[in-house]
């Protein structure tokens, strides 16, 4: 269900409700960090995703696992929210809700999400340079980087911000040269 329109339609009101709660308590960033942690855990564990999505597993078992897994590591408002999702049988949409919450948080804080694909891991200096360029291009106050490694790029980076793609990879440059040469002959 990841990324489906149906999932987004259900997740959005829950994410907005969580954002309203977080704003009223001035804990938007804290909840955002907790949502990132939850997304990381879900990304790492297919078993957990299957467990919380299973209609066969009892709600009390889901609550128990979530409490043991997340314990006091997340804000108690978010923990209560997760228990509500279990009770309402909406925990299956947890990933979409967290992603939607983070999108709302980025909008609130004038932050853009940039997906950067590079041939190798970026150094701290390269990360700063990419962030500075993205800020200049978008006018955003801050940038959240999501990095991916693709050795096939040979060198350089591909940066995706929203629907815009900036291809500064060696593979992209070679492709553009090839197109211009075949078009010129």
Curated annotation (Swiss-Prot):
Pfam families: OSCP (PF00213). PROSITE patterns: ATPASE_DELTA. Gene3D superfamilies: N-terminal domain of the delta subunit of the F1F0-ATP synthase (1.10.520.20). One of its GO terms (cellular component) is proton-transporting ATP synthase complex. The keyword Transport applies. Its main location: membrane. Transmembrane segments: none annotated. The keyword Transport applies. It is found in: Cellular thylakoid membrane. It is a peripheral membrane protein. One of its GO terms (molecular function) is proton-transporting ATP synthase activity, rotational mechanism. InterPro entries: ATP_synth_OSCP/delta_N_sf (IPR026015), ATPase_OSCP/d_CS (IPR020781), ATPase_OSCP/dsu (IPR000711). Keywords: ATP synthesis, CF(1), Hydrogen ion transport, Ion transport, Membrane, Thylakoid, Transport. Belongs to the ATPase delta chain family. HAMAP family: ATP_synth_delta_bact (MF_01416). F-type ATPases have 2 components, F(1) - the catalytic core - and F(0) - the membrane proton channel. F(1) has five subunits: alpha(3), beta(3), gamma(1), delta(1), epsilon(1). CF(0) has four main subunits: a(1), b(1), b'(1) and c(10-14). The alpha and beta chains form an alternating ring which encloses part of the gamma chain. F(1) is attached to F(0) by a central stalk formed by the gamma and epsilon chains, while a peripheral stalk is formed by the delta, b and b' chains. F(1)F(0) ATP synthase produces ATP from ADP in the presence of a proton or sodium gradient. F-type ATPases consist of two structural domains, F(1) containing the extramembraneous catalytic core and F(0) containing the membrane proton channel, linked together by a central stalk and a peripheral stalk. During catalysis, ATP synthesis in the catalytic domain of F(1) is coupled via a rotary mechanism of the central stalk subunits to proton translocation. This protein is part of the stalk that links CF(0) to CF(1). It either transmits conformational changes from CF(0) to CF(1) or is implicated in proton conduction. This is ATP synthase subunit delta. The gene is atpH.
């Amino acid at each position: 269900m990841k990324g489906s329109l149906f999932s987004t339609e259900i997740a959005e009101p829950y994410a907005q409700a969580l954002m309203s709660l977080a704003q009223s308590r001035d804990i938007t960033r804290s909840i955002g960090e907790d949502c990132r942690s939850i997304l990381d855990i879900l990304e790492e564990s297919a078993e957990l995703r299957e467990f919380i999505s299973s209609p066969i597993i009892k709600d009390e078992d889901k609550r128990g696992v979530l409490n043991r897994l997340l314990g006091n590591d997340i804000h108690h408002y978010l923990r209560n929210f997760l228990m509500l999702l279990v009770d309402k049988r909406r925990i299956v949409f947890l990933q979409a809700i967290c992603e939607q919450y983070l999108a709302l948080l980025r909008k609130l804080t004038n932050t853009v999400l940039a997906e950067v694909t590079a041939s190798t891991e970026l150094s701290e200096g390269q990360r700063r340079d990419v962030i500075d360029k993205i800020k200049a291009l978008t006018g955003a106050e801050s940038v959240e980087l999501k990095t991916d490694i693709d050795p096939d790029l040979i060198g350089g980076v591909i940066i995706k911000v929203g629907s815009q793609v900036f291809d500064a990879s060696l593979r992209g440059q070679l492709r553009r040269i090839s197109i211009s040469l075949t078009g010129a002959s």
